[in-house]
A protein has these predicted regions:
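Bacterial N-terminal signal peptides
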Residues: 12-23
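Bacterial N-terminal signal peptides that target proteins for export
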Residues: 2-14
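Cysteine-nucleophile amide-bond enzymes
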Residues: 26-473
Length: 473
């Protein structure tokens, strides 16, 4: 027992010494962001340890680090806390209105959430430190923070991605005050085995296939008309999805493609498959059930008239079919591994406080409000993929009972742009949306789920064009 206690203390001492042994003001880090460690050491006593009244009496300062990057040290007050901020200088494009005209200009700014910003939060009531935040990503909602442990001697680490905690309360054997002067490189070294850094480091240059697909789809959107139950078969002929029968296309839209939301995602997958196989995907394998339904349950009764899992089956079978063509080997859905079922988060911060992250629910997917942080991680960890999304909504039965049904589907392309900022393009029912716009289509309904299946993106993408549509009278 004594040995275990000794080892635990030894680890704490080792971690503390490891932090101190690093070059104290290391400027370079793997995210290549500016660092204020040297500046923070110079101002620590006044700005970080002084009372609120003392800090209020200090003027904002502009100081330069060893490589010449300027930081502004300043105070900001909120209702119950006050913040001491070390923010790096950046430039912001602005429009200046003067003399009846507008001219573009560039102004210096010191944003609280810029990559390289450092924020100390303290209580107004007693001045006690609450947290230190390091901003390192181009997206303001992605950061790492440290909090004092209840023992008063050590600290806890959190990693946050858009209000979802990839790690929360990870114990570290160093005093909280370490983070007053620790560089970003030092805190990376300290937490490299404790925090999921791989989930927040974008892979530059690996999104080309997805971006080619996005641009090609975008260029074809003017030629797509939304129509219920509409798709094209393996020969490029218009058919009904429900029964595979030939579908009449009115003369006024003959020069366009008529597609339902499910036909639209098939059209995208066909654009991957046709260059490899010489034809489009057959419909019949795409409607095969992937979920065993209790025939006496609500879904079983509904299934007698309509498939409650239609777009779930459709997207799963589509992803498996694309994988089969690529591998030149028939893979059924159950053997394909195309479902996204990762659980990258433990908790989520909401208006009601911390809540356990619902995560993945089998044959249901993820809550829609969970999509943004999830897609951020997927874009980081699996940069060469896009996702087919089956959308689950709640339908009320004739006797007032509620059943989840999968009617529609979409294609989602998450990526990081040239500046390292996270983006997600959604193509749904022949229309392009940002992720925020797409989620807004469903309001704030908490019962919307999205089930994802992965498909590898490719620059060799040639979807069916209206001119190639065979006449079907």
């Amino acid at each position: 027992m004594e040995r275990k206690v000794f080892v635990k203390k030894g680890i704490s001492v080792f971690l503390f010494c490891a932090v101190c042994a690093l070059p104290f003001f290391a400027e370079w880090n793997s995210f290549d962001i500016p660092d204020s460690a040297e500046i923070r050491r110079q101002v620590s006593r006044e700005w970080f340890e002084g009372s609120l009244d003392v800090v209020r009496g200090l003027n904002s300062e502009i100081r330069s680090n060893q490589v010449g990057t300027q930081f502004q040290i300043r105070l900001e007050e909120q209702q119950d806390i006050f913040l001491v901020i070390a923010a790096p200088k950046s430039q912001m494009k602005v429009d200046i209105y003067e003399g009846g005209g507008v001219r573009a200009a560039v102004e210096d700014s010191y944003n609280i959430d810029s990559p390289g910003a450092w924020i100390l939060a303290r209580s107004k009531q007693n001045g006690s430190p609450l947290s230190v935040r390091y901003c390192f990503a181009k997206d303001a909602g992605v950061y790492v923070q440290f909090r004092p442990n209840q023992d008063g001697r050590t600290s806890l680490a959190d990693m946050i991605i858009f209000d979802s905690y990839a790690a929360r309360g990870v114990p570290l054997g160093v005093p909280f005050e370490t983070f007053y002067t620790a560089s970003f490189a030092q805190i990376q070294a300290l937490t490299k085995n404790n925090l999921p850094w791989a989930s927040v480091q974008p892979k530059a240059g690996l999104y080309d296939g997805a971006l080619v697909m996005v641009q090609t789809i975008r260029e074809n959107l003017p030629n797509i008309v939304s129509e219920d139950d509409a798709a094209y078969n393996e020969e490029g002929l218009p058919v009904f999805i429900n029964n595979g029968q030939s579908r009449y296309v009115p003369q006024e839209v003959r020069q366009k493609l008529t597609l339902s939301s499910n036909g639209f995602v098939k059209w995208i997958c066909d654009g991957i498959v046709e260059p490899l196989a010489g034809s489009y995907l057959k419909l019949k394998p795409l409607v095969q059930p992937t979920v065993n339904v209790n025939p006496t349950g609500a879904k079983g009764v509904l299934a007698a008239k309509y498939s409650a899992n239609f777009s779930l089956d459709w997207t799963r079978n589509l992803a498996a079919a694309v994988l089969s063509v690529r591998n030149n080997k028939t893979l059924l859905y159950k053997d394909s591994g195309v479902d996204v079922s990762v659980e990258p988060f433990a908790t989520r911060w909401t208006d009601k406080g911390f809540q356990n992250a619902a995560g993945y629910i089998a044959n249901t997917g993820y809550r829609m409000q969970y999509l943004k942080p999830l897609l951020y991680v997927l874009a980081t960890v699996n940069p060469q993929y896009f996702y087919l999304a089956a959308i689950r909504q709640t339908a009320k039965g004739s006797v007032g009972n509620e059943t989840g049904v999968f009617n529609d589907s979409a294609a989602i392309f998450p990526y990081f742009d040239a500046d390292g900022k996270f983006k997600a393009i959604v193509f749904f029912d022949g229309v392009e949306y940002s992720l925020q716009q797409f989620c807004s289509l469903y309001g704030k309904a908490g019962d919307i789920f999205v089930h994802l299946t992965r498909v590898k993106a490719t620059a060799k993408f040639y979807p069916q064009e209206p001119a190639k549509e065979k006449k079907n009278d």
